Amino acid sequence: MGYKNKICIISSSRADYNHLYPLMLGIKKSKELDLQIIATGMHLIRKHGMTYKEIENDNFFIDCKVPSKQKTTSANSLVEAMATELKGIAVAFSQLKPDLVIILGDRYDIFPAAIATHILQIPLAHIHGGEVTSGVIDDGIRHSISKLANLHFVATNEFKNRLISMGEENKSIVNIGSLAVQGNK
């Protein structure tokens, strides 16, 4: 068997994992692809239930666990947690050497992965870009991730058009519909 492209999916919470599950299952079953999983963020926080165990219970192997060590919900604590996570993600990428990284959404705890892929020149696919959640920090993070991404998988043509208006190339954007509809396990 020849080289299998290494596809690294980063999951930070039960919410994104439920959407990513069918994609992860498809990659795992593929003869051409090698699934890598990094669990981070809320998955690794005791008060949120250590939900990385759900991934393992679904018979997926987690290649790396990258804690953010967030202490509080203050802005300073979030920034410190993101810095810690950025360092951990860089170490994970140097070990795993992924050919493509896939992230979903707009959470602050996946933003460090997008930054790392950009600096390390690892192609990044972003799922659910182009969306808007007015009045919260999510929009800035989501749009920043979209600007760092090489491939975009959006839920509607409206979101595709928003990415195009932000300067993303039409050929790099695919409307796949909502993974929330597809992903119910």
Residue spans for each PLM region:
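An aromatic- and histidine-rich active-site surface loop
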Residues: 102-119
